[in-house]
């Protein structure tokens, strides 16, 4: 998926849970990553900075291949 700043996305559970990043940290991901709308605020290489606005959470960097358009 080609992404750009301002796109509304969510994380793909299967790709995030089986990733190298998940194996290096806590694998209990909060549900808002998969269920709520996040806005791409920056992109650096293969990673996108996502801001989830509905809940008071910090922004998070995810690989762009772990994201899908929020429908």
UniProtKB/Swiss-Prot annotation:
Keywords: Membrane, NAD, NADP, Plastoquinone, Quinone, Thylakoid, Translocase, Transport. It catalyses: a plastoquinone + NADH + (n+1) H(+)(in) = a plastoquinol + NAD(+) + n H(+)(out); a plastoquinone + NADPH + (n+1) H(+)(in) = a plastoquinol + NADP(+) + n H(+)(out). Pfam families: NdhO. The keyword Zinc-finger does not apply. GO terms for cellular component: plasma membrane-derived thylakoid membrane. The keyword Thylakoid applies. GO terms for molecular function: oxidoreductase activity, acting on NAD(P)H, quinone or similar compound as acceptor; quinone binding. Its EC number is 7.1.1.-. It is found in: Cellular thylakoid membrane. It is a peripheral membrane protein. InterPro entries: NdhO. It is an enzyme of class 7 (translocase). NDH-1 shuttles electrons from an unknown electron donor, via FMN and iron-sulfur (Fe-S) centers, to quinones in the respiratory and/or the photosynthetic chain. The immediate electron acceptor for the enzyme in this species is believed to be plastoquinone. Couples the redox reaction to proton translocation, and thus conserves the redox energy in a proton gradient. Cyanobacterial NDH-1 also plays a role in inorganic carbon-concentration. NDH-1 can be composed of about 15 different subunits; different subcomplexes with different compositions have been identified which probably have different functions. Belongs to the complex I NdhO subunit family. This is NAD(P)H-quinone oxidoreductase subunit O. It comes from Nostoc punctiforme (strain ATCC 29133 / PCC 73102). The gene is ndhO.
């Amino acid at each position: 998926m080609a992404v750009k700043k301002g796109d509304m996305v969510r994380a793909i559970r299967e790709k995030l849970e089986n990733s190298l990043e998940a194996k290096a940290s806590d694998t209990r991901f909060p549900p808002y990553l998969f269920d709520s709308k996040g806005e791409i605020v920056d992109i650096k290489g293969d990673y996108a900075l996502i801001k989830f606005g509905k809940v008071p959470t910090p922004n998070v960097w995810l690989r762009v291949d772990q994201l899908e358009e929020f429908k």
